[in-house]
Amino acid sequence: MNHQSRKADAFDKIRKYDNDLVKYYEIEIIDYEPISAKAYKLVTNANNEYFFKETNDVALEKYQYLANQGISNILYPLENIEKRFITKTTQRSFYINNYIQQIPIREDAKVANMFNELNTLHNQTSMRKTLDPSKSRVKFDELSSQLDYKFRVLEQMVRRVESRPLDIFSMPILENYHTILNAKKELVKLQKRIISSVKARESVNYSFLHNNPSIDHLLNVRGVNYLTSIDNGKTGISSLDMAKFYVKNESYDIDFKSMILNEYYDENHLFYYDYFRYLVLVIYIKRMPVSTEDYINASTFVETSNCITRYFNFSDYKEETRYPNETNNN
């Protein structure tokens, strides 16, 4: 869809909020620019520029919670005339911010800055909780079922490829399948260790997670970095945020090894590091599309295999610490 088509399609949608913007923010739109399906740049009759975003109803609770905690590296929405960050209407909930024009900086620098701000968020909202086997079991059972199904589908696809003469598309699939199987073995090993921690009801830190840690959700305002778009944030274990962050950005020339090592590796308490590694592999496997077209599958296998290979190079810089109940067969 070209720019003009996007703008035309957005016209009716954004105009539905005209009265609400006047009522709750005392601003009148004279122009707008679509940024995404839910976000717009607005220009008012006073020639001021705002960022407008549709959101969910519970976003108010999240922004209010972080504000009450005094978390300073969040870019909070502008308050409406009711002193609320989020405005609920008959259309949808939304919020606005001053539109901040960003100066282009190197992507790898943004990645490093995002890592620092995520750590700040996690550390400042940290609270100790005991791992709950009853809650964790449901999640792991569901995840295990999804992974088992995905590995079965991948195996069936590989067997189908093996039954045919080799060609330029089947070769990459067969050559890289062993890497997928190595990931499966690693997942089994890590899950056993994580479940062991859960059964022991270990005490761990829970934090507020951004839950969508893209570098697009980091803004620099007069030299200070702020996290944005925490609409989908939740309370959880920071390994989840970092796994998502790593998968999105591991291709950049950043020293992820030392960054993750310094933050998560503790030979006396491997839970956070194990959970991070486990989630990285889960993301890689779950996002693999399986197509009826072998050229698509070949590309998928090569890309995923390369990611998993970098993962093993990344994670193997420390010797494995054995749990007491793990036997050494050497």
Name each model feature, range by range.
Residues S134-F208, M259, F312-N313:
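ATP-dependent phospho-/nucleotidyl transfer catalytic cores
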Residues T44-K135:
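ATP-binding pocket architecture of kinase catalytic cores
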Residues M1-I29:
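Juxta-kinase regulatory segment immediately upstream of eukaryotic protein kinase catalytic domains
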Residues Y24-Y40, N45-V58:
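N-terminal ordered "arm"
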Residues R92-E107, L154-S163, Y284-V302:
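A glycine-centered beta->alpha junction motif in the catalytic cores
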Residues A39, P77, K189-M242:
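Active-site acidic catalytic loop and adjacent metal/ATP-binding pocket
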Residues R164-D167, R193, S197, D294-N330:
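Helical subdomain adjoining the active site within ATP-dependent kinase catalytic cores
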Residues S238-Y272, V282-N313:
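Active-site activation/catalytic loop segments of kinase-like enzymes and analogous catalytic loops
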